[in-house]
Amino acid sequence: MSIVTLLKNDEFTDLKYYVKANTPKKKSFKSNVSDKPFEKLPMRVEYGEIEPYQARRIGHIADYMFSLVLARFVVKYKTEIYESLNWRALQLYEGCFKNNQLRKNHKQVELHFEEALKITRNFVDDKKIELGEVIQAAYTIFKMEDYLHYVQFYSGEQFLYNFLEPCDDAVVEQVKQLTYVFEETFIESGLVQKNSVVVCHPWFEPWSYKCGGGIADIYIDGILYDFKSTKEMGYHWDEVGQVYAYYLLNCLCKKDSKEDETVYIDAPLAGMEIAGIAIYFSRYGDIEKCELSQCGATVSEEDLAYLEKIINKHADDAQEKAMSEIERICNMKR
């Protein structure tokens, strides 16, 4: 259970309906490349003949590469971005992987994973390295981050084979093209500056946890972005609502931080303003952005009190469902 799941089903109707009713509408957005918001545009990176599993890989690896590009470019937040980007993979590596029987005789996995971390760090430090090699390393880190999925469906030797298997050429080539478009859209355009404030994968504790999980893609200079690498583009309330829900959770964190400054440790945006939300359609180089204050989507103290009430009402159930699945998989014996 997570924010995404909550918005797609009717189990927690009061929270879903609140977010849906207040999510900025299509007309509130502005595109960086078109006069009309969410207008169908020519695809700059063609989808091609790829399988669903390849599309999933492309989405995850491209998101990772976008953050690496930002970490390499900015000055102040370079290390913070890199560490946040790899936090989940490292947690699973140190926790689930090393404590599971799959680790036996899998020194190759450890070496492969640690080499991937070294390659991506060198890229961030602006060392000369071929982009395809960085993408292969990003794929390795993605597989460790996706460990719960892999350990659930593969036995020990199958896991080893799949973990060491390189990313196929079709995926690598598409991620390359998506990375080039991202660099043009965010870096070369001047949207991101050397001194930009960038926070990768911000979470919103304790409110993310109470909703069963919730981590945003990236925050850049007051705007919270969600990345989409699918071939379809258009306005969908639940996709926009997901980013808006993160804004709401951050508002709750900011409220908490007035009473307890340690909130900043688990909610990195609690001390920052989210002035707007945006969807980036990476195959089109299109950013659809909404300034929250201009469309009446900011929240009052009364709104926050209501949100706090309904989230707390469902918190135990959402947490239990999220944690029981993670614990079940981590404790599997192969």
Where are these predicted regions, by residue range?
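Conserved catalytic cores of phosphodiester-cleaving nucleases, focusing on short active-site segments
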Residues: 217-232
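Metal-dependent nuclease catalytic regions and adjoining charged, substrate-binding loops involved
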Residues: 259-334
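Residue(s) in the substrate-gating loop at a strand-loop-helix junction
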Residues: 1-181
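Eukaryote-skewed repeat-based solenoidal scaffolds used as protein-protein interaction platforms
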Residues: 176-201
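Active-site-adjacent loop/helix micro-motif of nuclease/hydrolase catalytic cores
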Residues: 232-242
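Active-site metal-binding core of divalent-cation-utilizing nuclease and nuclease-like domains
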Residues: 192-219
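An active-site-proximal "capping" alpha-helix that borders the catalytic cofactor pocket
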Residues: 242-249
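Short strand-coil-strand connectors
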Residues: 212, 221, 282-284
